Design a protein with these regions (language model features):
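Periplasmic-binding protein-like
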Residues: 33, 118-133, 199-235, 239
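Active-site regions of enzymes building and remodeling cell-envelope glycoconjugates
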Residues: 112-117, 161-168, 201-207
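Short, hydrophobic/proline-enriched secondary-structure or compact coil segments at domain edges
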Residues: 143-145, 188, 219-222
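N-terminal hydrophobic or amphipathic helices and topogenic motifs
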Residues: 1-84, 93, 213-215, 227-259
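A ligand-binding cleft/hinge motif common to bilobed small-molecule-binding domains
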Residues: 98-111, 177-206
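Short helix-initiation/N-cap motifs at beta->coil->alpha
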Residues: 76-87, 166-180
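Mid-protein regulatory/catalytic core that forms ligand/cofactor-binding pockets
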Residues: 52-157
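Short, acidic/turn-prone active-site loops that include or flank metal/cofactor-
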Residues: 102-104, 120-123, 170-172, 191-194, ...
Length: 259
């Protein structure tokens, strides 16, 4: 009890918290300054590993999450590939990482990670589909695969199962052009602009019949399992409803992203 009282007095005297004492009814925590509290646990800023913001959904997510940390120094490290984001998180380079639920479930089989925030379906991407040249969806022999994308690897394995289909390593952002050139027959891709497919002579087939395809659309935030201050900070500052509303305003064009 003595240590607890001493800690509370230190926090109170620094202005990090305000306690209201009510005699026999006890004492109540009535105000907290999260920015000031962070200094007491040696956290001067928060850095989140985030996908490259090449879609409005990603921009809205980045902008909405940053807005929740108002008053707290919060920064992004944008990088492609969930594997590298999680590796940097585990190595202590960053404090948290945004990945899909599908990727997160594969990483959580390892030790050292905590699923700290879940945002629901279609908060990470809209929908993945199988892209191929028109009329050739039944003739796929070579499928493109970016080995840095945990989602694409898992979904490709789920969709093609034990089929005799060759996996061809390529960059995710080159996928459509590689199909057009005939280097590969198909790729699993997050379709953002349907008109782009039409112009390229490609068609999209929705992925269904497996819950993992839906998991790939959900954004989650991972922390290190022993980073209790960061987990508590997320619980304290993030209003999920406000974050998602912010994301949708960015997607619809009502609000410019800021991240």
């Amino acid at each position: 009890v003595g240590l607890t009282q001493a800690a509370l007095k230190t926090l109170e005297s620094s202005g990090a918290i305000r306690i209201e004492r009510r005699g026999r009814n006890g004492s109540y925590l009535v105000e907290m300054d999260n920015k000031a509290l962070l200094t007491h646990v040696d956290i001067n800023n928060v850095v989140c590993a985030m996908p490259l913001p090449y879609t409005r959904l990603y921009e809205g997510l980045a902008s909405g999450l940053k807005a929740q940390f108002d008053g707290i120094p919060f920064y992004y490290a944008h990088m492609r590939g969930a594997d590298i984001r999680v590796e940097c998180l585990l190595n202590g380079v960053y404090d948290m990482a945004v990945v899909s639920r599908l990727a997160a479930e594969s990483y959580l089989t390892q030790k050292g990670l905590c699923l700290a925030l879940e945002l629901g379906p279609h908060t990470y991407v809209g929908e993945h589909q199988l892209i191929c040249r028109k009329g050739e969806s039944a003739n796929v022999k070579r499928v493109g695969l970016d080995n840095r994308s945990a989602d694409q690897k898992i979904m490709t394995d789920v969709f093609f199962g034990g089929s005799d289909v060759e996996r061809v390593d390529l960059s995710y952002h080159e996928s459509l052009q590689r199909i057009v050139k005939g280097d590969v027959d198909a790729v699993i891709w997050n379709v953002v602009a349907e008109n782009e497919l039409t112009m390229l002579g490609l068609e999209a087939t929705p992925l269904t019949d497996d819950p993992r395809f839906l998991q790939a659309t959900e954004a989650v935030v991972l922390t290190r399992v022993d980073d209790y201050p960061m987990q508590q900070l997320l619980r304290a500052v993030v209003d999920k409803h406000a974050l998602l509303a912010h994301q949708q305003r960015v997607v619809s064009g009502e609000q410019e992203p800021s991240y």
